[in-house]
Amino acid sequence: MSRYRPPRTAGTPLITPEGAARLRAELHELWHVRRPQVTQAVSEAAALGDRSENAEYIYGKKMLREIDSRVRFLRKRLENLKVVGERPADPNRVYFGAWVTLEDEDGEQARYRIVGPDELDLRNNQISIDSPLARALVGKELDAEVLVRTPAGEKLWFVVEIEYPPAP
């Protein structure tokens, strides 16, 4: 299993269809693949005898607790999420799921997709709808000026392009 993920506070309960599919795939992987593997390893370690000083047994039990915690979180989160896949009535405004191309005062461009907090992925330019930038962008039209207040200070952006993925 990857690194430990502490429980998060629930953000906006929106998610794209792709994000929901990733969470369901993670849940399936944990419950049907990883948990049986770790359970088998714990059973084999327990069969070796003394459990008090059995590092494999102790580590396996810890892994089971982490897997079970993540499974509980995913099940509960998936129940409460609203999948938003349809295009908005006004595609010339920024809403959830939009790819937005921005340009700053120096002419440098950046492109972001507004997604749910469970899908946040800065390497792929996917920002949470709860972020200061996304909150400032939602509802803006093409060519709008957007002043974004972040912990690093204020920055002025211009909305250059708004694009929505095709509906599933």
UniProtKB/Swiss-Prot annotation:
Coiled-coil zones: 61-84
Keywords, in A-Z order: Coiled coil, DNA-binding, Transcription, Transcription regulation
GO MF terms held by the record: DNA binding; RNA polymerase binding
GO terms, biological process: DNA-templated transcription elongation; regulation of DNA-templated transcription elongation
InterPro entries cross-referenced by the UniProt entry: GreA/GreB_C_sf, TF_GreA/GreB_CS, Tscrpt_elong_fac_GreA/B, Tscrpt_elong_fac_GreA/B_C, Tscrpt_elong_fac_GreA/B_fam, Tscrpt_elong_fac_GreA/B_N, Tscrpt_elong_fac_GreA/B_N_sf, Tscrpt_elong_fac_GreB
One Pfam family recorded for the sequence: GreA_GreB_N
UniProt superkingdom: Bacteria
PROSITE patterns reported in the protein's UniProt record: GREAB_1
Gene3D superfamilies per record: Transcription elongation factor, GreA/GreB, C-terminal domain (3.10.50.30), Transcription elongation factor, GreA/GreB, N-terminal domain (1.10.287.180)
Family per similarity comment: Belongs to the GreA/GreB family. GreB subfamily.
Chain's role: Necessary for efficient RNA polymerase transcription elongation past template-encoded arresting sites. The arresting sites in DNA have the property of trapping a certain fraction of elongating RNA polymerases that pass through, resulting in locked ternary complexes. Cleavage of the nascent transcript by cleavage factors such as GreA or GreB allows the resumption of elongation from the new 3'terminus. GreB releases sequences of up to 9 nucleotides in length.
NCBIfam families: greB, PRK01885.1
UniProt-recorded name of the protein: Transcription elongation factor GreB
Organism: Pseudomonas aeruginosa (strain ATCC 15692 / DSM 22644 / CIP 104116 / JCM 14847 / LMG 12228 / 1C / PRS 101 / PAO1)
UniProt lineage: Bacteria, Pseudomonadati, Pseudomonadota, Gammaproteobacteria, Pseudomonadales
Name of the gene: greB
